[in-house]
Amino acid sequence: MTFRIETAARGRFAVFILSGRIEAPAIAELRRLFELQSDYRDIVLDLKDVGVVDRDVMHFFARCEADGVKLDNCAPYIREWMEREKD
């Protein structure tokens, strides 16, 4: 299964709507898109349609959130995994 990234604007936020199975190779594309933004605090990752993520992506999401990126519609299993890895 592949992943997909759609972009949208929500007020002052650049929204990246992710779907599918997100694996480590997707991180480079997400970083590239982030670099096109002037401020990470203005980025939202909408994870509503994300099915599965691998460990690298989970760590990437955690770092993004720590840097001020908003994670919308984050699946409970991803959120719990991020919390467990923090400990």
Predicted feature locations:
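Short beta-strand/loop segment at the start of cytosolic alpha/beta domains
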Residues: 1-15
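Amphipathic alpha-helical interaction surfaces in cytosolic regulatory modules
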Residues: 18-87
